[in-house]
Amino acid sequence: MSSNKVTITEVAKHAGVSVTTVSMVLGNKGRISPDTIEKVNASVEALGYIRNRAAANLRSNSSEIIGLILKDISDPYDAEVTAGLSEEIEQQGYMLFLAQCGDSQEKFEHCVLTMARQGVGGIAFCSIGENQQLNVD
């Protein structure tokens, strides 16, 4: 994999459009003609452009990631819930960020804080320990 990342400016130049237009096409925002969308997408493909989702999430103050904290990922129930949740949220355009905390309150809190710092759109809990609780300060 090349260390020379293709920039949005290069995509815009290749497609013959503005950087703003490329950004709008990539974000599915605004009213862009089908021909322009096709040109931008062709340039993205031709140049191998990969959108930096972390940067886009910072700009939009949103995330396409949902966190799921489990007690034990090897538990059949947890595995089934994970599979079902993953399938459902992917249909909504989200991806799953999975963490396992066991019975440790400290690890549970660490998982929640890590997910929050990563900017997840939400956090779900499944089969966490009965004594685990979230202390929000």
Swiss-Prot record:
Signal sequence region: none
Positions of the DNA-binding region: 8-27
Keyword terms of this UniProt record: DNA-binding, Repressor, Transcription, Transcription regulation
Keyword Transcription among UniProt keywords: yes
A family per Pfam: Peripla_BP_1
The HTH lacI-type domain, residue ranges: 6-60
SUPFAM superfamilies for the chain: lambda repressor-like DNA-binding domains, Periplasmic binding protein-like I
InterPro entries given in the database record: HTH_LacI (IPR000843), Lambda_DNA-bd_dom_sf (IPR010982), Peripla_BP/Lac1_sug-bd_dom (IPR001761), Peripla_BP_I (IPR028082)
One GO MF term attached to the UniProt entry: transcription cis-regulatory region binding
Top-rank taxon, per record: Bacteria
PANTHER family from the UniProt entry: HTH-TYPE TRANSCRIPTIONAL REPRESSOR PURR-RELATED, LACI-RELATED TRANSCRIPTIONAL REPRESSOR
Function of the molecule: Repressor for the malX and malY genes.
UniProt-recorded name of the protein: Maltose regulon regulatory protein MalI
Native source organism of the sequence: Vibrio furnissii
Lineage of the organism: Bacteria, Pseudomonadati, Pseudomonadota, Gammaproteobacteria, Vibrionales
Gene that encodes the chain: malI
